UniProtKB/Swiss-Prot annotation:
GO biological process, one term: pyrimidine nucleotide metabolic process
E.C. designation(s): 2.7.4.25
UniProt-annotated location(s): Cytoplasm
Catalytic activity: CMP + ATP = CDP + ADP; dCMP + ATP = dCDP + ADP
Entry keyword set: ATP-binding, Cytoplasm, Kinase, Nucleotide-binding, Transferase
Family label: Belongs to the cytidylate kinase family. Type 1 subfamily.
Protein name: Cytidylate kinase
Length: 219
């Protein structure tokens, strides 16, 4: 009798900053009991490693060394969510060698597990192009800026809405126009516009797609 290996069931969720993809990914992971990796945190962790050592953010060799020694299980979302770290992360994220190192680590995470949920900017296109289900979550810049603004206020920090909106638009342009792994939906991705959709509505839409894909995966 022939033996065969069942491919891991991977849910790939992509989208621009503050689109709600992370919240949706966590909701899906919790519902299905799947391990979750926020790949954006990996870039933030590299940036923090450089900042902690007082190293320059524009040195690709140093940033790549930090990426290669990164422990995915040691990342602290609360610490890495700081605005300054996010700004620093956007600088190291454009470095091809850093992206290659982190993509390899992210891919290993997904392929080493029976099932997983990964969210980021290039999961369905680069990290896990063979993912069982691909979602691309988007929302208007204004809606995303309002969400980010509310998040900052909820943490007890001060924020300027116009500044956050300008930063998001700048990040969108950088993400979509970079030569290595630009932000774009995979050809077979399901689009979810969360501009006027609650997280629960987005989850229910995603759940319907995932349940169908799971049934096919299990045969």
């Amino acid at each position: 009798m022939k033996s065969f290996v069942v491919a891991p069931f991977i849910v790939a969720i992509d989208g621009p900053a503050a689109s709600g993809k992370g919240t949706l990914a966590r909701r899906i992971a919790t519902h299905y009991g799947m391990p979750h990796l926020d790949t954006g945190l990996t870039y933030r962790a590299v940036a923090k490693a450089l900042l902690d050592k007082g190293l320059p953010l524009d040195d690709e060799a140093l940033a790549t060394d930090a990426a290669l020694s990164l422990d995915l299980l040691a990342m602290d979302k609360a610490v890495l969510s700081a605005h300054a770290i996010g700004e620093a992360a956007s600088k190291v994220a454009v470095m091809p060698a850093v992206r290659r190192a982190l993509v390899e680590a992210q891919r290993h995470f997904a392929n080493a597990l029976p099932s997983s949920v990964l969210d980021g900017r290039d999961i369905g296109t680069v990290v896990c192009p063979d993912a069982a289900i691909k979602l691309f979550v988007t929302a208007s810049p204004e809606v995303r800026a309002r969400r980010r603004f509310d998040e900052v206020l909820a943490r007890g920090d001060t924020a300027d809405f116009a500044e956050i909106l300008a930063d998001l638009k700048k990040r969108d342009e950088r993400d979509m126009n970079r030569t290595d792994s630009p932000l774009r939906p995979a050809e077979d991705a399901h689009l979810l516009d969360a501009s006027e959709m609650s997280i629960e509505a987005a989850f229910l839409a995603a759940k319907k797609l995932i349940d169908h894909a799971l049934a096919q995966h299990r045969g």
